[in-house]
Amino acid sequence: MELVVKSVSPETLKTATLVVTVGESRVLAGAARTVDILSGGAVSLILKRGDLAGKVGQSLLLHNLPNIKAERVLLVGTGKEDELSDRQLKKIVGAALTCLKGLGGTDAAIALDDLSVKNRDTYGMARLLVEALADGEYVFDRFKTQKAEVRALKKITLLTDKVKAADVERASTHAQAIATGMALTRDLGNLPPNICHPTYLGEEAKALGKAHKNLKVEVHDEKKLADLGMGSFLAVAQGSAQPPRLIVMNYQGGKKGDQPFVLVGKGITFDTGGISIKPASGMDEMKFDMCGAASVFGTLRAVLELKLPINLVCILACAENMPSGTATRPGDIVTTMSGQTVEILNTDAEGRLVLCDALTYAERFKPQAVIDIATLTGACVVALGGHTSGLLGNNDALINQLLDAGKQADDRAWQLPLFDEYQEQLDSPFADIANIGGPKGGTITAACFLSRFTKAYHWAHLDIAGTAWLSGGKEKGATGRPVPLLTQYLLDRAGV
Protein backbone atom coordinates (compact mmCIF):
# COMPACT_ATOMS: atom_id res chain seq x y z
CA MET A 1 0.00 0.00 0.00
CA GLU A 2 1.40 3.37 -1.07
CA LEU A 3 1.13 6.26 1.38
CA VAL A 4 1.25 9.83 0.10
CA VAL A 5 1.20 13.10 2.06
CA LYS A 6 -0.53 16.06 0.39
CA SER A 7 -1.46 19.59 1.40
CA VAL A 8 -4.60 20.26 -0.64
CA SER A 9 -8.20 21.09 0.21
CA PRO A 10 -10.10 17.83 0.79
CA GLU A 11 -12.93 18.72 -1.55
CA THR A 12 -10.53 19.22 -4.50
CA LEU A 13 -8.87 15.81 -4.34
CA LYS A 14 -9.95 13.19 -6.86
CA THR A 15 -10.14 9.95 -4.91
CA ALA A 16 -12.42 6.96 -4.55
CA THR A 17 -13.22 7.76 -0.91
CA LEU A 18 -12.59 10.78 1.31
CA VAL A 19 -12.58 9.94 5.03
CA VAL A 20 -13.72 12.70 7.42
CA THR A 21 -14.65 12.61 11.10
CA VAL A 22 -17.75 13.53 13.08
CA GLY A 23 -18.06 13.62 16.89
CA GLU A 24 -21.10 12.84 19.02
CA SER A 25 -21.87 16.56 19.30
CA ARG A 26 -22.39 16.44 15.52
CA VAL A 27 -21.03 19.97 15.29
CA LEU A 28 -19.11 19.84 12.04
CA ALA A 29 -15.57 21.15 11.83
CA GLY A 30 -12.57 21.00 9.53
CA ALA A 31 -12.94 18.82 6.45
CA ALA A 32 -16.43 17.65 7.43
CA ARG A 33 -17.63 21.27 7.64
CA THR A 34 -16.04 22.13 4.29
CA VAL A 35 -17.68 19.13 2.64
CA ASP A 36 -21.01 20.07 4.19
CA ILE A 37 -20.90 23.68 3.00
CA LEU A 38 -19.85 22.82 -0.56
CA SER A 39 -22.44 20.05 -0.82
CA GLY A 40 -25.25 22.37 0.22
CA GLY A 41 -25.65 20.98 3.73
CA ALA A 42 -25.88 17.33 2.68
CA VAL A 43 -23.89 16.11 5.70
CA SER A 44 -25.86 18.22 8.20
CA LEU A 45 -29.14 16.93 6.80
CA ILE A 46 -28.07 13.30 7.20
CA LEU A 47 -26.90 13.93 10.77
CA LYS A 48 -30.20 15.61 11.65
CA ARG A 49 -31.98 12.48 10.50
CA GLY A 50 -29.99 10.51 13.07
CA ASP A 51 -28.21 8.26 10.59
CA LEU A 52 -24.89 8.67 12.45
CA ALA A 53 -24.56 9.19 16.21
CA GLY A 54 -20.83 9.95 16.00
CA LYS A 55 -19.79 7.25 18.46
CA VAL A 56 -16.21 6.00 18.21
CA GLY A 57 -15.88 3.62 15.29
CA GLN A 58 -19.32 4.21 13.77
CA SER A 59 -19.28 4.93 10.05
CA LEU A 60 -21.61 6.10 7.30
CA LEU A 61 -20.86 6.13 3.57
CA LEU A 62 -22.18 8.90 1.31
CA HIS A 63 -22.10 8.79 -2.49
CA ASN A 64 -21.78 11.51 -5.13
CA LEU A 65 -21.98 14.62 -2.97
CA PRO A 66 -22.29 17.75 -5.12
CA ASN A 67 -19.14 19.88 -5.60
CA ILE A 68 -16.93 17.21 -4.01
CA LYS A 69 -14.35 15.55 -6.27
CA ALA A 70 -14.27 12.34 -4.21
CA GLU A 71 -16.62 9.61 -5.46
CA ARG A 72 -17.61 8.80 -1.88
CA VAL A 73 -17.33 10.45 1.52
CA LEU A 74 -16.94 8.18 4.54
CA LEU A 75 -18.04 9.73 7.84
CA VAL A 76 -16.37 8.10 10.85
CA GLY A 77 -17.41 8.74 14.45
CA THR A 78 -14.87 10.06 16.97
CA GLY A 79 -16.97 10.03 20.16
CA LYS A 80 -17.56 12.63 22.86
CA GLU A 81 -14.10 13.91 23.64
CA ASP A 82 -12.18 16.54 21.69
CA GLU A 83 -9.05 14.40 22.02
CA LEU A 84 -8.90 10.68 21.34
CA SER A 85 -6.99 8.02 23.24
CA ASP A 86 -4.50 5.84 21.37
CA ARG A 87 -6.95 2.98 21.56
CA GLN A 88 -9.82 5.07 20.17
CA LEU A 89 -7.71 6.21 17.22
CA LYS A 90 -6.90 2.59 16.38
CA LYS A 91 -10.59 1.71 16.61
CA ILE A 92 -11.46 4.54 14.22
CA VAL A 93 -8.80 3.44 11.74
CA GLY A 94 -10.04 -0.14 11.96
CA ALA A 95 -13.62 0.92 11.29
CA ALA A 96 -12.58 3.00 8.30
CA LEU A 97 -10.46 0.19 6.87
CA THR A 98 -13.26 -2.35 7.24
CA CYS A 99 -15.56 -0.12 5.24
CA LEU A 100 -12.96 0.83 2.62
CA LYS A 101 -12.06 -2.80 1.93
CA GLY A 102 -15.68 -3.51 1.03
CA LEU A 103 -15.81 -0.82 -1.63
CA GLY A 104 -14.90 -0.89 -5.30
CA GLY A 105 -12.25 1.81 -5.03
CA THR A 106 -8.56 1.10 -4.59
CA ASP A 107 -7.56 4.42 -3.05
CA ALA A 108 -8.69 6.72 -0.27
CA ALA A 109 -7.78 9.98 1.43
CA ILE A 110 -7.88 10.75 5.16
CA ALA A 111 -8.26 14.27 6.55
CA LEU A 112 -5.63 14.15 9.31
CA ASP A 113 -5.95 17.66 10.71
CA ASP A 114 -9.37 16.92 12.22
CA LEU A 115 -7.89 14.22 14.46
CA SER A 116 -6.36 14.98 17.83
CA VAL A 117 -4.90 12.39 20.21
CA LYS A 118 -4.15 12.98 23.88
CA ASN A 119 -0.48 13.64 24.64
CA ARG A 120 0.53 13.24 20.99
CA ASP A 121 1.77 15.88 18.58
CA THR A 122 1.24 15.73 14.83
CA TYR A 123 4.13 13.28 14.36
CA GLY A 124 2.92 10.96 17.14
CA MET A 125 -0.68 10.94 15.95
CA ALA A 126 0.22 10.38 12.30
CA ARG A 127 2.65 7.59 13.12
CA LEU A 128 0.09 5.76 15.24
CA LEU A 129 -2.48 6.11 12.47
CA VAL A 130 -0.16 4.77 9.75
CA GLU A 131 0.90 1.83 11.93
CA ALA A 132 -2.78 1.04 12.55
CA LEU A 133 -3.45 1.16 8.79
CA ALA A 134 -0.61 -1.27 8.15
CA ASP A 135 -1.74 -3.58 10.96
CA GLY A 136 -5.21 -3.72 9.44
CA GLU A 137 -3.75 -4.74 6.09
CA TYR A 138 -1.75 -7.70 7.47
CA VAL A 139 -2.84 -11.16 6.30
CA PHE A 140 -1.09 -14.50 6.83
CA ASP A 141 -2.55 -16.98 4.36
CA ARG A 142 0.57 -18.72 3.05
CA PHE A 143 -0.83 -22.18 3.76
CA LYS A 144 -4.42 -21.52 2.68
CA THR A 145 -5.27 -23.21 -0.61
CA GLN A 146 -8.17 -20.79 -1.03
CA LYS A 147 -7.15 -17.20 -0.35
CA ALA A 148 -9.67 -14.77 1.10
CA GLU A 149 -11.00 -12.39 -1.54
CA VAL A 150 -10.20 -8.99 -0.06
CA ARG A 151 -9.91 -5.83 -2.11
CA ALA A 152 -6.55 -4.34 -1.28
CA LEU A 153 -6.11 -0.61 -0.99
CA LYS A 154 -3.30 0.43 -3.31
CA LYS A 155 -2.95 4.01 -2.14
CA ILE A 156 -3.91 6.18 0.84
CA THR A 157 -3.38 9.93 0.82
CA LEU A 158 -2.86 11.67 4.15
CA LEU A 159 -4.21 15.21 3.95
CA THR A 160 -2.62 17.87 6.15
CA ASP A 161 -1.67 21.53 5.96
CA LYS A 162 1.75 22.64 4.73
CA VAL A 163 3.01 23.49 8.23
CA LYS A 164 2.48 19.92 9.42
CA ALA A 165 3.44 18.10 6.22
CA ALA A 166 7.10 17.49 7.15
CA ASP A 167 6.11 15.93 10.49
CA VAL A 168 3.53 13.72 8.79
CA GLU A 169 6.09 12.63 6.15
CA ARG A 170 8.58 11.72 8.87
CA ALA A 171 5.91 9.87 10.86
CA SER A 172 4.81 7.95 7.77
CA THR A 173 8.39 6.92 6.95
CA HIS A 174 9.03 5.68 10.49
CA ALA A 175 5.66 3.95 10.74
CA GLN A 176 6.05 2.11 7.44
CA ALA A 177 9.47 0.82 8.48
CA ILE A 178 8.08 -0.36 11.82
CA ALA A 179 5.12 -1.97 10.05
CA THR A 180 7.50 -3.81 7.70
CA GLY A 181 9.42 -5.09 10.72
CA MET A 182 6.24 -6.13 12.50
CA ALA A 183 5.01 -8.00 9.43
CA LEU A 184 8.28 -9.95 9.25
CA THR A 185 8.04 -10.74 12.97
CA ARG A 186 4.46 -11.93 12.57
CA ASP A 187 5.29 -14.01 9.51
CA LEU A 188 8.14 -15.80 11.30
CA GLY A 189 6.03 -16.34 14.40
CA ASN A 190 3.06 -17.67 12.45
CA LEU A 191 5.10 -20.19 10.45
CA PRO A 192 4.63 -23.81 11.56
CA PRO A 193 7.52 -25.39 13.49
CA ASN A 194 8.15 -28.02 10.82
CA ILE A 195 9.22 -25.16 8.55
CA CYS A 196 10.50 -22.49 10.93
CA HIS A 197 13.29 -24.31 12.77
CA PRO A 198 16.76 -23.05 13.75
CA THR A 199 18.30 -23.88 10.36
CA TYR A 200 15.50 -22.01 8.57
CA LEU A 201 16.09 -18.92 10.71
CA GLY A 202 19.78 -19.14 9.89
CA GLU A 203 19.00 -19.16 6.17
CA GLU A 204 16.66 -16.18 6.59
CA ALA A 205 19.45 -14.29 8.33
CA LYS A 206 21.89 -15.08 5.53
CA ALA A 207 19.39 -13.87 2.93
CA LEU A 208 18.97 -10.61 4.82
CA GLY A 209 22.73 -10.22 4.97
CA LYS A 210 23.11 -10.73 1.21
CA ALA A 211 20.56 -7.97 0.59
CA HIS A 212 22.40 -5.37 2.71
CA LYS A 213 26.08 -4.55 2.34
CA ASN A 214 26.40 -3.10 5.83
CA LEU A 215 25.00 -6.22 7.51
CA LYS A 216 27.43 -9.01 8.36
CA VAL A 217 25.84 -12.36 9.25
CA GLU A 218 27.37 -15.36 10.99
CA VAL A 219 25.47 -18.57 11.72
CA HIS A 220 27.20 -20.81 14.25
CA ASP A 221 26.43 -24.54 14.39
CA GLU A 222 26.62 -26.97 17.32
CA LYS A 223 30.34 -27.57 16.82
CA LYS A 224 31.03 -23.86 17.17
CA LEU A 225 28.75 -23.69 20.22
CA ALA A 226 30.78 -26.49 21.80
CA ASP A 227 34.03 -24.67 20.97
CA LEU A 228 32.62 -21.57 22.67
CA GLY A 229 31.74 -23.59 25.78
CA MET A 230 27.99 -23.05 25.50
CA GLY A 231 27.05 -26.12 27.52
CA SER A 232 23.77 -24.63 28.69
CA PHE A 233 22.59 -23.75 25.17
CA LEU A 234 23.55 -27.19 23.86
CA ALA A 235 21.73 -28.93 26.72
CA VAL A 236 18.41 -27.53 25.51
CA ALA A 237 18.96 -28.70 21.94
CA GLN A 238 20.31 -32.18 22.62
CA GLY A 239 16.91 -33.88 22.67
CA SER A 240 15.95 -32.70 19.19
CA ALA A 241 16.82 -33.87 15.70
CA GLN A 242 16.90 -30.19 14.72
CA PRO A 243 20.40 -28.76 15.30
CA PRO A 244 20.74 -25.47 17.22
CA ARG A 245 21.97 -22.25 15.68
CA LEU A 246 23.50 -19.11 17.18
CA ILE A 247 22.77 -16.36 14.66
CA VAL A 248 24.78 -13.13 14.84
CA MET A 249 23.78 -10.19 12.62
CA ASN A 250 26.07 -7.15 12.83
CA TYR A 251 24.69 -3.91 11.35
CA GLN A 252 27.19 -1.10 10.83
CA GLY A 253 25.20 2.09 10.33
CA GLY A 254 27.21 4.26 12.71
CA LYS A 255 30.83 5.30 12.86
CA LYS A 256 33.54 2.69 12.99
CA GLY A 257 34.45 2.17 16.62
CA ASP A 258 31.09 3.34 17.99
CA GLN A 259 29.89 0.96 20.68
CA PRO A 260 26.94 -1.06 19.40
CA PHE A 261 23.58 -1.72 20.93
CA VAL A 262 22.90 -5.44 21.26
CA LEU A 263 19.55 -7.22 20.98
CA VAL A 264 19.40 -10.85 22.11
CA GLY A 265 16.37 -12.93 21.09
CA LYS A 266 15.12 -16.22 22.47
CA GLY A 267 14.51 -18.49 19.47
CA ILE A 268 12.96 -21.72 20.75
CA THR A 269 11.24 -22.72 17.53
CA PHE A 270 9.10 -25.29 19.31
CA ASP A 271 8.88 -25.90 23.03
CA THR A 272 7.37 -29.16 24.24
CA GLY A 273 8.88 -28.54 27.66
CA GLY A 274 11.31 -31.41 27.08
CA ILE A 275 11.24 -34.19 29.68
CA SER A 276 9.24 -31.79 31.92
CA ILE A 277 6.64 -31.97 29.18
CA LYS A 278 3.81 -29.48 28.79
CA PRO A 279 0.10 -30.43 28.65
CA ALA A 280 -1.18 -31.28 25.17
CA SER A 281 -3.83 -28.56 25.26
CA GLY A 282 -2.51 -25.44 23.60
CA MET A 283 0.92 -26.94 22.88
CA ASP A 284 0.56 -25.92 19.22
CA GLU A 285 1.07 -22.34 20.37
CA MET A 286 4.58 -23.19 21.49
CA LYS A 287 5.70 -22.42 17.95
CA PHE A 288 5.46 -18.82 19.19
CA ASP A 289 8.27 -19.45 21.68
CA MET A 290 10.67 -18.00 19.11
CA CYS A 291 8.88 -14.64 19.00
CA GLY A 292 11.74 -12.99 20.90
CA ALA A 293 14.08 -13.90 18.05
CA ALA A 294 11.40 -12.96 15.52
CA SER A 295 11.03 -9.51 17.09
CA VAL A 296 14.79 -8.98 16.86
CA PHE A 297 14.59 -9.90 13.16
CA GLY A 298 11.75 -7.42 12.73
CA THR A 299 13.50 -4.62 14.60
CA LEU A 300 16.62 -5.12 12.50
CA ARG A 301 14.48 -4.97 9.36
CA ALA A 302 13.03 -1.63 10.51
CA VAL A 303 16.52 -0.30 11.27
CA LEU A 304 17.69 -1.35 7.81
CA GLU A 305 14.70 0.36 6.18
CA LEU A 306 15.43 3.58 8.08
CA LYS A 307 19.22 3.35 7.65
CA LEU A 308 19.67 4.44 11.27
CA PRO A 309 23.13 5.88 12.04
CA ILE A 310 23.90 3.39 14.80
CA ASN A 311 25.77 0.12 15.20
CA LEU A 312 23.53 -2.78 16.16
CA VAL A 313 24.32 -6.42 16.90
CA CYS A 314 21.48 -8.95 16.89
CA ILE A 315 22.07 -12.33 18.53
CA LEU A 316 19.49 -15.09 18.14
CA ALA A 317 19.72 -18.21 20.30
CA CYS A 318 17.76 -20.78 18.31
CA ALA A 319 16.94 -24.35 19.34
CA GLU A 320 14.07 -26.82 19.63
CA ASN A 321 13.16 -28.25 23.04
CA MET A 322 12.07 -31.87 22.60
CA PRO A 323 11.83 -35.01 24.79
CA SER A 324 13.85 -38.02 23.67
CA GLY A 325 16.39 -40.55 24.87
CA THR A 326 19.09 -37.92 24.43
CA ALA A 327 17.19 -35.05 26.06
CA THR A 328 18.36 -33.23 29.16
CA ARG A 329 16.96 -34.68 32.41
CA PRO A 330 15.81 -32.84 35.53
CA GLY A 331 18.80 -32.94 37.83
CA ASP A 332 21.43 -32.61 35.09
CA ILE A 333 24.18 -30.07 35.73
CA VAL A 334 25.70 -28.10 32.83
CA THR A 335 28.51 -25.59 32.52
CA THR A 336 27.68 -22.29 30.85
CA MET A 337 29.95 -20.22 28.62
CA SER A 338 30.61 -17.97 31.63
CA GLY A 339 31.97 -20.95 33.60
CA GLN A 340 29.06 -20.94 36.05
CA THR A 341 27.33 -24.27 36.58
CA VAL A 342 23.55 -24.72 36.43
CA GLU A 343 21.40 -27.47 37.91
CA ILE A 344 18.47 -28.03 35.57
CA LEU A 345 15.51 -28.73 37.84
CA ASN A 346 12.90 -28.19 35.13
CA THR A 347 13.62 -28.68 31.43
CA ASP A 348 10.67 -26.43 30.58
CA ALA A 349 12.65 -23.47 31.92
CA GLU A 350 14.81 -23.69 28.82
CA GLY A 351 14.70 -20.15 27.49
CA ARG A 352 17.01 -18.84 30.17
CA LEU A 353 19.42 -21.69 29.42
CA VAL A 354 19.97 -20.57 25.82
CA LEU A 355 19.87 -16.89 26.71
CA CYS A 356 22.52 -17.06 29.42
CA ASP A 357 25.14 -18.26 26.93
CA ALA A 358 24.02 -15.73 24.32
CA LEU A 359 24.26 -12.95 26.92
CA THR A 360 27.78 -14.04 27.82
CA TYR A 361 28.65 -14.04 24.11
CA ALA A 362 27.38 -10.43 23.87
CA GLU A 363 30.25 -9.22 26.09
CA ARG A 364 32.73 -9.43 23.22
CA PHE A 365 31.03 -6.55 21.42
CA LYS A 366 31.65 -4.09 24.30
CA PRO A 367 28.06 -2.86 24.00
CA GLN A 368 26.48 0.42 25.04
CA ALA A 369 23.50 -1.62 26.21
CA VAL A 370 22.10 -5.13 25.85
CA ILE A 371 18.39 -5.90 25.68
CA ASP A 372 17.13 -9.47 25.64
CA ILE A 373 13.66 -10.26 24.39
CA ALA A 374 11.98 -13.52 25.32
CA THR A 375 8.66 -15.28 25.74
CA LEU A 376 10.14 -16.39 29.04
CA THR A 377 7.54 -16.98 31.75
CA GLY A 378 3.87 -17.79 32.13
CA ALA A 379 4.15 -15.88 35.39
CA CYS A 380 4.45 -12.67 33.39
CA VAL A 381 1.11 -13.38 31.72
CA VAL A 382 -0.45 -13.90 35.16
CA ALA A 383 1.06 -10.66 36.46
CA LEU A 384 0.51 -8.34 33.49
CA GLY A 385 -1.95 -10.08 31.17
CA GLY A 386 -1.71 -9.65 27.43
CA HIS A 387 -1.39 -5.88 27.18
CA THR A 388 1.95 -5.08 28.76
CA SER A 389 5.44 -6.61 28.51
CA GLY A 390 7.47 -7.19 31.66
CA LEU A 391 10.68 -5.16 32.01
CA LEU A 392 13.58 -5.75 34.38
CA GLY A 393 17.24 -4.80 34.30
CA ASN A 394 20.36 -3.59 36.06
CA ASN A 395 20.44 0.04 34.91
CA ASP A 396 17.80 2.63 35.78
CA ALA A 397 18.59 4.92 32.85
CA LEU A 398 18.17 2.08 30.35
CA ILE A 399 14.93 0.96 32.00
CA ASN A 400 13.51 4.49 31.84
CA GLN A 401 14.52 4.86 28.19
CA LEU A 402 12.66 1.66 27.34
CA LEU A 403 9.59 2.65 29.36
CA ASP A 404 9.51 5.99 27.55
CA ALA A 405 9.95 4.30 24.17
CA GLY A 406 7.07 1.95 24.93
CA LYS A 407 4.84 4.87 25.84
CA GLN A 408 5.72 6.76 22.66
CA ALA A 409 5.18 3.68 20.49
CA ASP A 410 1.98 2.56 22.27
CA ASP A 411 3.80 -0.72 22.95
CA ARG A 412 4.00 -0.52 26.69
CA ALA A 413 6.17 -2.26 29.23
CA TRP A 414 6.03 -2.28 33.02
CA GLN A 415 8.99 -2.51 35.35
CA LEU A 416 9.18 -5.33 37.87
CA PRO A 417 11.73 -5.40 40.72
CA LEU A 418 15.06 -7.16 40.60
CA PHE A 419 15.87 -7.12 44.31
CA ASP A 420 18.72 -9.17 45.75
CA GLU A 421 16.32 -11.03 48.04
CA TYR A 422 14.91 -12.93 45.04
CA GLN A 423 18.35 -14.28 44.12
CA GLU A 424 18.27 -16.70 47.06
CA GLN A 425 15.44 -18.64 45.41
CA LEU A 426 17.93 -19.82 42.78
CA ASP A 427 20.31 -21.44 45.26
CA SER A 428 21.28 -25.03 44.43
CA PRO A 429 22.97 -27.53 46.80
CA PHE A 430 24.84 -29.08 43.87
CA ALA A 431 25.66 -26.28 41.39
CA ASP A 432 26.28 -22.54 41.34
CA ILE A 433 22.68 -21.85 40.40
CA ALA A 434 19.37 -23.64 39.76
CA ASN A 435 17.40 -22.86 36.63
CA ILE A 436 14.14 -22.25 38.51
CA GLY A 437 13.34 -20.46 41.72
CA GLY A 438 10.09 -22.04 42.87
CA PRO A 439 6.48 -21.01 42.27
CA LYS A 440 6.66 -17.44 43.61
CA GLY A 441 7.78 -14.46 41.56
CA GLY A 442 8.57 -16.54 38.49
CA THR A 443 9.16 -13.61 36.13
CA ILE A 444 11.50 -11.97 38.62
CA THR A 445 13.50 -15.09 39.43
CA ALA A 446 13.90 -15.83 35.71
CA ALA A 447 15.37 -12.35 35.27
CA CYS A 448 17.52 -12.90 38.37
CA PHE A 449 18.94 -15.97 36.64
CA LEU A 450 19.82 -13.91 33.55
CA SER A 451 21.30 -11.14 35.69
CA ARG A 452 24.07 -13.54 36.76
CA PHE A 453 25.38 -13.35 33.18
CA THR A 454 25.02 -9.61 32.50
CA LYS A 455 27.30 -7.92 35.03
CA ALA A 456 29.72 -6.63 32.38
CA TYR A 457 27.27 -4.17 30.78
CA HIS A 458 24.00 -2.27 31.08
CA TRP A 459 21.21 -4.78 30.51
CA ALA A 460 17.43 -4.97 30.28
CA HIS A 461 15.13 -7.94 29.90
CA LEU A 462 11.75 -7.83 28.13
CA ASP A 463 9.43 -10.71 28.99
CA ILE A 464 6.94 -10.78 26.11
CA ALA A 465 5.13 -14.01 27.00
CA GLY A 466 1.83 -12.14 27.23
CA THR A 467 2.25 -9.72 24.35
CA ALA A 468 3.97 -11.66 21.54
CA TRP A 469 0.89 -13.56 20.34
CA LEU A 470 -2.87 -13.85 20.66
CA SER A 471 -4.56 -17.13 21.49
CA GLY A 472 -7.68 -18.68 19.99
CA GLY A 473 -10.23 -17.59 17.42
CA LYS A 474 -9.73 -15.65 14.21
CA GLU A 475 -7.27 -13.28 15.87
CA LYS A 476 -4.88 -16.09 16.83
CA GLY A 477 -1.31 -15.38 15.81
CA ALA A 478 1.83 -13.37 16.39
CA THR A 479 1.35 -9.66 17.16
CA GLY A 480 4.67 -8.23 16.02
CA ARG A 481 5.39 -6.79 19.45
CA PRO A 482 7.71 -5.41 20.79
CA VAL A 483 9.09 -4.18 17.44
CA PRO A 484 7.53 -0.71 17.91
CA LEU A 485 9.07 -0.33 21.38
CA LEU A 486 12.52 -1.52 20.31
CA THR A 487 12.55 0.56 17.13
CA GLN A 488 11.49 3.66 19.06
CA TYR A 489 14.29 3.05 21.55
CA LEU A 490 16.80 2.90 18.70
CA LEU A 491 15.26 5.93 16.95
CA ASP A 492 15.74 7.87 20.19
CA ARG A 493 19.36 6.74 20.47
CA ALA A 494 19.97 7.69 16.83
CA GLY A 495 18.34 11.08 17.36
CA VAL A 496 16.22 10.96 14.20
UniProtKB/Swiss-Prot annotation:
Residues binding Mn(2+) 2: K266, D271, D289, E350
A GO cellular component entry from the record: cytoplasm
UniProt remark on cofactor binding: Binds 2 manganese ions per subunit.
Gene3D superfamilies noted in UniProt: Leucine Aminopeptidase, subunit E, domain 1 (3.40.220.10), Zn peptidases (3.40.630.10)
Residues where Mn(2+) 1 binds: D271, D348, E350
Gene Ontology biological-process entries: proteolysis
Catalytic site positions: K278, R352
Annotated GO MF terms: manganese ion binding; metalloaminopeptidase activity
Keyword Transport in annotation: no
Enzyme Commission number(s) from the entry: 3.4.11.1, 3.4.11.10
UniProt subcellular location: Cytoplasm
Alphabetical UniProt keywords: Aminopeptidase, Cytoplasm, Hydrolase, Manganese, Metal-binding, Protease
Catalytic activity: Release of an N-terminal amino acid, Xaa-|-Yaa-, in which Xaa is preferably Leu, but may be other amino acids including Pro although not Arg or Lys, and Yaa may be Pro. Amino acid amides and methyl esters are also readily hydrolyzed, but rates on arylamides are exceedingly low; Release of an N-terminal amino acid, preferentially leucine, but not glutamic or aspartic acids
Known role: Presumably involved in the processing and regular turnover of intracellular proteins. Catalyzes the removal of unsubstituted N-terminal amino acids from various peptides.
Family: Belongs to the peptidase M17 family.
Official protein name in the record: Probable cytosol aminopeptidase
Organism expressing this protein natively: Pseudomonas syringae pv. syringae (strain B728a)
